[in-house]
Amino acid sequence: MLALGKLLELTLTDHEPAEKTQVTPKGARLRWLGEGALEVRPAESDDCGLDLLLSAGIHGNETAPIELLERLLHGVANGKIRPRARVLFLFGNPAAIRKGERFIEQDINRLFNGRHELSSGFEALRAAELEQFARVFFSKPGRNRLHYDLHTAIRGSKIEQFALYPYKEGRKHSRRELARLAAAGMEAVLLQSKSSITFSAFTYEQLEAEAFTLELGKARPFGQNEQVNLDKLEERLIRIIEATEPEDESSLDGLQLFSVSREIIKHSDSFHLHLPADIENFSELSKGYLLAEDLAEMRWVVEEEGARIIFPNPKVKNGLRAGILIVPDSGQRLG
């Protein structure tokens, strides 16, 4: 095994490799770019024209996606996977990964799209660094660009594996990409309708990549992810890396689509979310339900048919999103 194929080990030990570039048995070049960052470049004759960014560990306690990327990188390094795409592997928050914690000072996935410039501390610096890694990686003209940011969730979910598809004005969500997600085992996709400050939103809005946040199950410690089944996703990622996907894939069978109806914003310390602490993502809420209250008699009452809640979190900082109210989407606006 090439030393650079052990990116997780290098990250966990906070070790900088002496050898920054190595070549795999299949002729692919591995290049260490910095802490938690490794580029895989296929042999020139193998290059299919795709630039694929795979990120995990934006939250340090979300280990199943980190282990998945490590398996893929091992496959490339030992020659079992022959890459035809350029791939950038990123472990988002190395310090938090080493501690097994969600973050050190603040949620790094709320610091992209320039938000880090309004903040300070370790995570703000790392968000800026991750943006730069992505910006350089996606700077080559005339290539297809794809970014999967892999996560697991704090809480359980009625729909265990789902994706969030960022928004940019004037740009349509791609049916082809949704079919790819369905083939990768995603059960649902949330089609977002406003700009965001997550990593995938940055690469989608600023770098013209097709980009997604993938939620893959419940967050657990390293070595305890037997219940998180990523077989379909792993198989699909290998196909993407090796450029062996079916060319005419278009089926969305079994894929549920949702759109954002409203975001619940916490404005003050008086904010109260009227939901059980253990409520699962995608739980249905009945029409007329009092969802949340805040200062100045501010109230959020469910008005939508078929409404569901995802990412409820009353402990966020004031001014941030404390939950998202979503509704089924017909998919009529897909490109």
From Swiss-Prot:
GO molecular function terms noted in the UniProt entry: hydrolase activity, acting on ester bonds; succinylglutamate desuccinylase activity; zinc ion binding
UniProt cross-references to Gene3D superfamilies, sorted A to Z: Zn peptidases (3.40.630.10)
Pfam families found in the cross-reference section: AstE_AspA_cat, AstE_AspA_hybrid
Active-site feature positions: E215
Cofactor note: Binds 1 zinc ion per subunit.
Residues reported in the UniProt entry to bind Zn(2+): H59, E62, H151
Annotated pathway: Amino-acid degradation; L-arginine degradation via AST pathway; L-glutamate and succinate from L-arginine: step 5/5
GO biological process: one example: arginine catabolic process to glutamate
Enzyme Commission designation: 3.5.1.96
Reactions listed under catalytic activity: N-succinyl-L-glutamate + H2O = L-glutamate + succinate
EC class name: hydrolase
Keywords, ordered alphabetically: Arginine metabolism, Hydrolase, Metal-binding, Zinc
Essential cofactor(s): Zn(2+)
Domain of life: Bacteria
Signal peptide per UniProt: none
Recorded family membership: Belongs to the AspA/AstE family. Succinylglutamate desuccinylase subfamily.
Protein name as it appears in the record: Succinylglutamate desuccinylase
Lineage per the UniProt record: Bacteria, Pseudomonadati, Pseudomonadota, Gammaproteobacteria, Pseudomonadales
